[in-house]
Amino acid sequence: MLKVPEHQVAGHIASDGKLGPLVDDQGRFFKPLQGDSRGEHEAKFYESFTSNMKVPDHIHRYFPVYHGTQLVEASDGSGKLPHLVLDDVVSGYANPSVMDVKIGSRTWYPDVSEEYFKKCIKKDRQTTTVSLGFRVSGFKIFDHQESSFWRAEKKLVLGYNADGARLALRKFVSSNSPADSNLTPNCAFASEVYGGCNGILAQLLELKDWFETQTLYHFNSCSILMIYENESILMQGGDDAPAPRAQVKLVDFAHVLDGNGVIDHNFLGGLCSFIKFIKDILQSVEKHDETDTSLLENGR
């Protein structure tokens, strides 16, 4: 039985009779091929990437596993349509917090139509795409105090400036109520989610190492998904704790082009900028912890 993804935070959402992705109960994600060339283009990318022996094994884990295409009943009731069949990257989580971040200082690319170029450049300038090299596209957080999800409003997210993006990244790893805009995010989960040898930062740095040399593809208008489960941190790895914790995935490949032997500076530059934001948050948390420790020691 196919259903609308519960944890999708950006992109085309299959609701109110609209065409969008679906998921099943077996951990598969069905993404409809868009009617123009973009859907076919994305399928060809997955086929190329999956079989490309030049892509290191450790890099493949940052991409959804591709299972080909399949005709399934479309979410808009238009009948059977071809869909990409991918691993549902959040299927292993009970209550995942998810953030979608579009990487790159531009989302358009050479030889696009004038209409598409104008659409992209307008949105790129209105968001932090041009100024920061990335933009937060959407996110949701599991509020363990309320045992429910809080989702950032799309209009608010698209209006973020640099401070707004920084605040969102801090809120994403905080334990205090995400719904209360008057609260300063406490970044209670930052060290466990962003930090550590297997945390978000370590994964982003591994991707960065590859992007500094790879010339196979140019990842235009692609996103990074960050996923984690705060309950597993709160339960401190007990027997009943959900797993895994933090994960990075790259998604949305309808606009990927051949690299033709040239480094993808657009994606790499945006990735480096995003990494700096994550590093800054971790450093501020470490500094705060050191201050608290010093105050405790002096108060003995």
UniProtKB/Swiss-Prot annotation:
It comes from the Eukaryota. InterPro entries: IPK, IPK_sf. Keywords: ATP-binding, Kinase, Nucleotide-binding, Nucleus, Phosphoprotein, Transferase. GO terms for molecular function: ATP binding; inositol tetrakisphosphate kinase activity; inositol trisphosphate kinase activity; inositol-1,2,3,4,6-pentakisphosphate 5-kinase activity; inositol-1,3,4,6-tetrakisphosphate 5-kinase activity; inositol-1,3,4-trisphosphate 6-kinase activity; inositol-1,4,5,6-tetrakisphosphate 3-kinase activity; inositol-1,4,5-trisphosphate 6-kinase activity. It is an enzyme of class 2 (transferase). Coiled coil: none annotated. It catalyses: 1D-myo-inositol 1,4,5-trisphosphate + 2 ATP = 1D-myo-inositol 1,3,4,5,6-pentakisphosphate + 2 ADP + 2 H(+); 1D-myo-inositol 1,3,4,6-tetrakisphosphate + ATP = 1D-myo-inositol 1,3,4,5,6-pentakisphosphate + ADP + H(+). Its main location: nucleus. GO terms for cellular component: nucleus; pollen tube. Disruption phenotype: Loss-of-function mutant atIpk2beta-1 (T-DNA insertion) is fully complemented by AtIPK2alpha in tissue but not in seeds, leading to the generation of phytate-free seeds. Increased sensitivity to 6% glucose during seedling development and decreased germination in response to the gibberellin biosynthesis inhibitor paclobutrazol (PAC). Belongs to the inositol phosphokinase (IPK) family. This is Inositol polyphosphate multikinase beta. It comes from Arabidopsis thaliana. The lineage of its organism: Eukaryota, Viridiplantae, Streptophyta, Embryophyta, Tracheophyta.
